[in-house]
Amino acid sequence: MIDVKLLRSNRELFEKNCEYRGVDKAIIDQFFKLDEEWRSVNRELNGQRAEKNRMTRAIAESLKRGKIVSNEKDRVELINEKIVSLEKKIREIEEERDRVLWTIPNLIHESVPICFGDENNKIVRYVGHAKVYRDDEEEFLKGSGGNGDYEVIDERPKSHVDLGQELGIIDLESAAKISGARFYFIKNRLLKLEMALENYAVDFLSQRGFTVVEPPYMLNLESMRGATDLETFKDTLYKIEDEDLYLIATSEHSIASMLSNEFLEEKELPIRVAGVSACFRREAGAHGKDTKGIFRVHQFNKIEQFIFCKPEDSWDYLEEILSNAEEIYRSLGIPYRVVNVCSGELGRLAAKKYDIEAWFPAQGKFREIVSASNDTDYQARSLNIKYRKSGGNEFVHTLNSTAIATTRILVAIMENFQEDGRIRIPDVLVPYTGFQYIDKE
């Protein structure tokens, strides 16, 4: 949620911000219309309360003098009825105004590219050595900014679906039979590889000061509304029937809500938390996309970075969580690029977002594996998370980033580390797996 006082004094700034994000500026008009109505009713309400206080004092003085005050008491009763009516009206206006306020997006950072479409995200850097099928060379050079390190290969790598089924480590048919599309069984060494990825990421983040948690996998509506953009996530979230609960789409939402309605001490900040959880997504808006395999699925495991910090430090911490994620993928040997996400693709909460996109040689394209965002005080306002500082209380800033979404990284490893019909395990994971290759079962 944005700062109401800031909005009231910077209407044009927020209108321009909506324009940059592709959001209808009419929501700003709606807010100011409701806000003026709220102010008008509030003035009347305060006037009635003041009149009641004046009348109450006058009645008390009259009673001291032995005067009859029945008429005055009748007037006070009428004022009370008016106050009750105005209080009800102002609550209704507040609810409608707040509903509009929730839809107004966060102010974007000055470094965000002003444009629309993922294809217009700004390439920040490319890292790694890629294998590029000859027909995909132009796509790779364009996606890496023209200077990516790569080698041309004459045969396209097998898809993770074909390779996984040949090696006996992925079973999609059985999962579809019992659960439907976008579910999977992963088996034996591929499962051990997934567990190795999780343990490696947990160790990596623990060594960098993160407290590792497994959060609740369900959140109530109040927490979910405060932590995320329900309008954006309406096609993503699973609602528990007859319960005020939703399955989480990411542990970010549980971790952010963990400190809702709390005051922190300045000395406690920053608070670094790594969430380890299953994630559940309906993917209702992804009809026809990645219908086969384990790249885009309804259930997957993810390690998430989250930081609560002081406002003046948040931009440094955005670079920190991005650097953490990059170090993980450099150590795995997965080629990737970092992009500065453009204004039209940020979502409502983020003031700035970086994506890390790995090169997938079987698909011949870069694809997102990490999103790292600074939500500034927007999420903290929605969840009412403040800290005490000299001179008054202030909202914290919140930041989040994927460390590893396991199914996507399994796909990246299967495509980038194919060797003679088997899968080579990245060196840093061998101590966790206990084996160097995945061969046919």
UniProtKB/Swiss-Prot annotation:
SUPFAM superfamilies: Class II aaRS and biotin synthetases, tRNA-binding arm. The keyword Nucleotide-binding applies. GO terms for cellular component: cytoplasm. L-serine binds at T250, S251, E252, E304, T402. It is an enzyme of class 6 (ligase). InterPro entries: aa-tRNA-synt_IIb, aa-tRNA-synth_II, aa-tRNA-synth_II/BPL/LPL, Ser-tRNA-ligase_type_1, Ser-tRNA-synth_1_N, SerRS_1_N_sf, SerRS_core, tRNA-bd_arm. It is found in: Cytoplasm. GO terms for biological process: selenocysteine biosynthetic process; seryl-tRNA aminoacylation. It comes from the Archaea. PANTHER family: SERYL-TRNA SYNTHETASE (PTHR11778). Consists of two distinct domains, a catalytic core and a N-terminal extension that is involved in tRNA binding. Belongs to the class-II aminoacyl-tRNA synthetase family. Type-1 seryl-tRNA synthetase subfamily. Catalyzes the attachment of serine to tRNA(Ser). Is also able to aminoacylate tRNA(Sec) with serine, to form the misacylated tRNA L-seryl-tRNA(Sec), which will be further converted into selenocysteinyl-tRNA(Sec). This is Serine--tRNA ligase. It comes from Thermoplasma volcanium (strain ATCC 51530 / DSM 4299 / JCM 9571 / NBRC 15438 / GSS1).
